[in-house]
Amino acid sequence: MELLSALSLDDLAASFSKLPVFPLFDVAYYIISILYLKYEPGAVDLSKRSPVASWLCAMLYCFGSYILADVLLGESPIHYFSNNANILLASAVWYLTFFCPLNIFYKIVSFLPVKLVLVGMKEVVRVRKIAMGIHHAHHHYHHGWVIMVLIGWVKGSGVALMSNLEQLLRGVWKPETNEILHMSFPTKASLYGAILFTLQQAHWLPISKAYLIFFFTLFMAVCKIYMTATHSHGSPFAIFESGICYVLFAAANGDHDDHGNHHHHHDDHDVSHSAGKSKEEHNEGTRKRKTKKAE
């Protein structure tokens, strides 16, 4: 904290943490979310065939994190739909993305320089949602650290965690695309961010919430802008994760491999033994037939 104070970032971090996300940043969040929906196979055909189903998918993309978090906390899953301004804005973005004449709106927001700005603005909303999720969970469960992490994670990546439900609305069923089995970078980053914000909420991390929001937003925005500009699907956490997994789980994996090899050798021995036994029985049967023929 002394180093951060020496950098004179107190006012900047405090101002940034209080920066309102509605309506500018929220609109950017809706645009990028629904843009990714349009990239999904069959999404355009669905919007023409069943606009209601397409609109529901768009609402899940925009508000799925709130819905899932409310369900986990035992609250009404449609509570967020009482925010008329947000629903109208998201609906307007959905309509313009799919039905704007000559596809003008889609061409503008998918133009790379514009898209990069919108992607960075979306990460501002994501980090703010993680922080609010931790605060909301702490209000219900003061010492439920796991619950805080879970709600913060869901708030940051709820739409990805609900991808299978959204696919069902589009008439698609791909259980192998489960986000928990194959986490994308935003899902992993939301989980790690939720852990950091929970540690800060528990006063185990010696940094203010304003600083954490500022630096984590900066990290997320830079990573996502770079990945979008380079069309990269890798993860900045890959090296860190591989090292941790090697330290924590490599021995167990080795034991499993040895166990599997032991079974393999045992099976080979059984097969060779059975083959030898069959050969002996065949030779003995041949001798008996020859003896009988001689008699």
From Swiss-Prot:
Lipid bilayer topology: Multi-pass membrane protein
GO molecular function, one term: metal ion binding
Catalyzed chemical reaction(s): K(+)(in) = K(+)(out)
Location within or outside the cell: Sarcoplasmic reticulum membrane; Nucleus membrane
Name of encoding gene: tmem38a
Functional description taken from the UniProt entry: Intracellular monovalent cation channel required for maintenance of rapid intracellular calcium release. Acts as a potassium counter-ion channel that functions in synchronization with calcium release from intracellular stores. Opened by a change of voltage within the sarcoplasmic reticulum lumen.
PANTHER family: TRIMERIC INTRACELLULAR CATION CHANNEL, TRIMERIC INTRACELLULAR CATION CHANNEL TYPE A
The protein's name: Trimeric intracellular cation channel type A
Region feature (Disordered): 258-295
Keyword Coiled coil part of the UniProt annotation: no
